[in-house]
């Protein structure tokens, strides 16, 4: 059964290496089923910065900054089959990678 839609897979992670490994495993699974694919497309990295005081009591000028970087990738799968969807659902991805699938 072939649908005429496309599936958009978005991957989020704090670690770039495991994000790229996950994207490559999805691309390999799609290429095995001989379906067209676009991506992985790197999306802008979201940087969240936190500034805290170093001292609990005095020294207001002494501060420390921390940041969290959220890396994103986008993969479009054109005309997916039901067998491809089953293989994507069974795919083992490393911990720390969030997957968002939309039609």
Curated annotation (Swiss-Prot):
NCBIfam families with a match to the protein in the record: PRK00596.1 (NF001861), rpsJ_bact (TIGR01049)
Lineage top rank: taxon: Bacteria
Subunit structure: Part of the 30S ribosomal subunit.
GO cellular component, one term: ribonucleoprotein complex
Listed HAMAP family: Ribosomal_uS10 (MF_00508)
UniProt-listed SUPFAM superfamilies: Ribosomal protein S10
Family statement: Belongs to the universal ribosomal protein uS10 family.
Organism: Borrelia recurrentis (strain A1)
Protein name, per record: Small ribosomal subunit protein uS10
GO molecular function: structural constituent of ribosome; tRNA binding
């Amino acid at each position: 059964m072939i649908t005429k839609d496309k599936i958009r897979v978005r991957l989020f992670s704090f670690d770039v290496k495991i994000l790229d490994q996950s994207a490559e495993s999805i691309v390999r699974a799609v290429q095995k089923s001989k379906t067209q694919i676009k991506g992985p497309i790197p999306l802008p990295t979201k940087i969240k910065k936190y500034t805290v005081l170093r001292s609990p009591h005095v020294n207001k000028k002494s501060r420390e900054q921390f940041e969290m970087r959220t890396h994103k990738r986008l993969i479009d799968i054109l005309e997916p089959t039901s067998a491809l969807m089953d293989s994507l659902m069974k795919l083992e991805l490393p911990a720390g990678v969030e997957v968002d699938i939309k039609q």
